[in-house]
Structure formats: structure tokens, C-alpha cells
Amino acid sequence: MTPSERTSIIELIKREVIPAIGCTEPIAVALCVAKATEILGCKPHRIEAHLSANILKNAMGVGIPGTGMIGLPIAIALGALIGKSEYGLEVLKECTPDAVEAGKRMIADEAISIKLKEGITEKLYIEITASAATTASSATTASAATTASSCPQSATAIIAGGHTNFIYLSHNGEVLLDAPLKSTAEQNGNKTALTLKKVYDFATTAPLEEIEFILEAQRLNKAAAETSFKGRYGHQLGRTLKESTREMSILGNNTFSKILSYTTAACDARMAGVMVPVMSNSGSGNQGITATLPITIYAEENNKSREELIRALTLSHLTVIYIKQSLGRLSALCGCVVAATGSSCGITYLMGGGYNQISFAVQNMIATLTGMVCDGAKPSCSLKIASGVSTSLLSAILAMEEQCVSSVEGIIDNDVDKSILNLTRIGSESMNETDHAVLDIMTHKGC
């Protein structure tokens, strides 16, 4: 691998593995609102949001940090009231109780409109128009009297293709930015085109000082889990797995149960809207959690070295990034399938596996979890993460025994990269109708 290739991959990881507070879809909407408000230059009197189906799906049932509330309206209100676009996916980190109360009043005043954006194919699309009627005073030459006139102001911001990727900005009709939406391949560039072998080679040979930044993912995501253990968030799966005597009699107090408890606990806190940052991957905090904590706990429980941990985390996160390159940011496929595949690679590496065993682990994961639907971000995501992480451990164990699902079985190909493309084809193309059905069910449940 050339130095330029290595540099390109490091830059890719640093773009995709970033801190986030709260579920990234409503937070991305808040970010877009914050930018539109900044362009407007004052508090908007009305905000219109036109969103893709996948953004709507992932924002309907998830907690918004620091609010005790769920869903888009409060995220939009806070984006306008206290959001700062310079903070990126931590846009709401300065939320206060007073701001939440002001946001509730904004919602009660029906100042926020949320609609499905029709006629688009992009799955990650956020269009915000913020408007206000400012009062301007003008003095007549005939007298000292002044007259007040209403001067309508508006600003539009559009994010598409990535959770922080602004493609359009305007103020009162004047276009400030109009950037064409690039494909995933164009965004990544040819230099960062990946294969599983390239991912493995990079993770196992890159100079340690160039990739040790990945340890920040361990620090943030483990802290999120430990915060969760102290409270009662979501379905409390992580806390239950850690403390329940019933659980102890079934799973015991071992590496497996500890991995499950830490990983699901971090998800419990995040989906409940706890004001705690996590390290995300490819725009998803849950993916970042799932790619990080199983490896972190396995390494701690088995006394692995700092270098082994760094390389395993790098392998996991870069595998997730690689799979997402062809799957896309949002899809009908649950993101834990992808993230747990990354963690299975990292755990296999920590078990002493080489490239062949890591390939086997990926094949086993694809054979098992392909087709798990995403029905939005919500507290029960922790249950899906538990399924994904359990499978990642089983897949790694099988791989170390040289057991691999073969190409005569289902969607598995002899070439692991082709198996990955089979997975992402199903998730990004074949499950589109599933996505429509899921959103239709979610929006017509009558609850």
C-alpha cells in the first residue's frame, strides 16, 4: 500500500468516524435548521421541513437529547433556537431547560411544518425553509413621523447524501451555494475505493501512531454505556443484562454477556435522548457503538495489547465504511447488520485470525442477518443490536474453526467482496418496496 493510499484511507476514517450527540437523523435536521436560521439572521416565525422517507422513518420515535421528548418537532425548534451549525452533529449540545420550554411554545404555535419530499430518489434528503417578517422603519421627509413596514425574509438550506453535507443555501432567493449531489463513489474518490483485503492490510500494517486516534471511539462509547448503567433508559436492556439474576442464571457473568450489556446499554442511552456523545460511523451512532464496544470489551476481558485493540477497532470501523460505500447512508436494511459485521472482523482478529478467517466471519454474518429491516431509530434498536452482536461473536467463533457458509448456500459467493455486494444490493435496491411498506405502516398505526 502506497503512502498516498494510506493517507487517503486515514482521511476517510476521520470523515466517517466522528462524535455525535443524539440520533443522527433528527440531529441532521436540527443542523439544517440551524444553518437556515443563521442565514436568516433572526429567529424564524415559520419553519417548513421537506424530508425524504428514510429521514422521517428514522426520526419519528427517537429521543432528542436534553429534552425528554421524541421526534422531529422539538429537534427542529431547538435547531432554530439554540443550534449552531459549526458544531456539526453536536449541534444541540448547548440545549437548556429554558430552550426546551421555548421549543414547546414554538410547537404549540404551529410554527413548524413537516412534510414528505416527493419525487426524489435520494434517501438522505433534508430541505428546510425558515421565514420571518422583520419590521423596518422609514422616516418621511415631510415630517418626523415613521411608518413601519413588514419585510418578509426567508432562507433555505438543503442537506443531501450525508448527514452534514450541505448542497444548497439561499437567502431571499439569492443562491449562496448550489453544489451538485455527488454519488458515494464520487464523494470517496478513486483513492479510497476499498476491498476487504485492502481494509485488512491497512488495519494490520499502518503505523500505529497514524491510527491510534481510533481509541477515542473506545473512550466515548464505553462512557456512554457506563452512563446508561446509572440510569433507566429505553428498554434498559444493557442494565438488565448486567444486573438481572435471571440473566445470570441463563447467560452467566462472562465475556459474552458483558459484551452484550455494554453495547446495548450505550444504545439504550442514545435512543432515549441522553445528552452524551458517542462516536458514530458513516452517520450512525448505533453503528459506531456496535463497531466499537464488542471489540473493546473482548480486548479487556482477554488482556489484549493496546496495539491489538487499535488495529481491531480500525479493522472494524473501516469494514463498516467499506460496506456502506455500496449500501448507502440510509436503507431498508438495519445498520446493525453492517456494524456487527465490522465487529465480527475485529473480534476474529483479536482471536488470532488472519485474512482468511476474517473473510469467513464476513460470509457467516451475511448468511445470517441479511434482510433484517430498519423500522426507524427508536429504543428497541438495542434489541436488534443484541441480535447483531450475538451473531458477530458466533460468526467469529465459527470462522476460527475454519467453518464458513459456502457459495452453494443462498446469496454467498466464493468471493467475499461479491458477497458484500450481494448484501448491499438487497439492502439498497431489492428492499426499496419494503422501505415504503414500513413507512406506510409507521405513519398509519393510529397511535
Model-derived segments and spans:
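A structural-propensity feature for long, helix-poor, extended segments
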Residues: 45-89, 100-112, 308-356, 368-393
